[in-house]
């Protein structure tokens, strides 16, 4: 078993749906978790498919919620965005960018390959200080409410297995292979260093 609590980060594009659903579930299971986005702005589905609503990362979830409530309560209730923002507000004040975080993690889960690439590139561009390893694992999760929930439960299962592991470094590859077979998903995995 790990001698200390597993430190987990979950990263998606905007830190609104996929990473926050995983944050919510992992937190409820008592895991040490933070969540992030990687883009320069938060983009939410707008009233039309090609017209997203764009916010700065400094905008709180409550401010986004109130803005969308004023703009079109029915539309944003129907598409689930108001529900998501309400949940997010109960977890933390607002979205955070991964590139601005200086905390160390044991495992970082990303929700799509472009986010994985951004996280790995960012970690590799930082000056190495402690040479502590961090495992970066990508799991493709579609940006829908249902897929975010399913992905969050799979991330949670992996984290719980890692928490019980005698040696995470030795057991992670085997665990990922087992999860790939069980879930029918493939994972990208690499190790970076702080």
From Swiss-Prot:
Keyword annotations: Hydrolase, mRNA processing, Nucleus, Protein phosphatase
The main place the protein resides is nucleus
- Annotated S-S bridges: none
One GO BP annotation is: termination of RNA polymerase II transcription
Which leading EC class covers this enzyme?
hydrolase
- Listed InterPro entries: Ptyr_pPase_sf, RNA_pol_II_suA
Pfam families xrefs: Ssu72
- Sample GO molecular function, one term: RNA polymerase II CTD heptapeptide repeat phosphatase activity
Record's function text: Protein phosphatase that catalyzes the dephosphorylation of the C-terminal domain of RNA polymerase II. Plays a role in RNA processing and termination.
What is this protein identified as? RNA polymerase II subunit A C-terminal domain phosphatase SSU72 like protein 2
- Annotated organism of origin: Homo sapiens
Q: Organism classification, top ranks?
A: Eukaryota, Metazoa, Chordata, Craniata, Vertebrata
């Amino acid at each position: 078993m790990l001698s200390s609590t597993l430190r987990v980060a979950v990263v998606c594009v905007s830190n609104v749906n996929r990473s926050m659903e995983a944050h919510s579930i992992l937190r409820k299971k008592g895991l040490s978790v933070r969540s992030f986005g990687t883009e320069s702005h938060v983009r939410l589905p707008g009233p039309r498919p090609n017209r997203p609503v764009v916010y700065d990362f400094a905008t709180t979830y409550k401010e986004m919620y109130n803005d969308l409530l004023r703009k079109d309560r029915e539309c944003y209730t129907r598409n689930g965005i108001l529900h998501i923002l309400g949940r997010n507000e109960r977890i933390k004040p607002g979205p955070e960018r991964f590139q601005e975080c200086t905390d160390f993690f044991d495992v970082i889960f990303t929700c799509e390959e472009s986010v994985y690439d951004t996280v790995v590139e960012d970690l590799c561009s930082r000056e190495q200080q402690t040479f502590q390893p961090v495992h970066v694992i990508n799991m493709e999760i579609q940006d829908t409410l249902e897929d975010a929930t399913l992905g969050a439960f799979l991330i949670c299962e992996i984290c719980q297995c890692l928490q019980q592991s005698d040696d995470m470094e030795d057991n992670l590859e085997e665990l990922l292979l087992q999860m790939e077979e069980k879930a029918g998903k493939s994972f990208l995995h690499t190790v970076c260093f702080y």
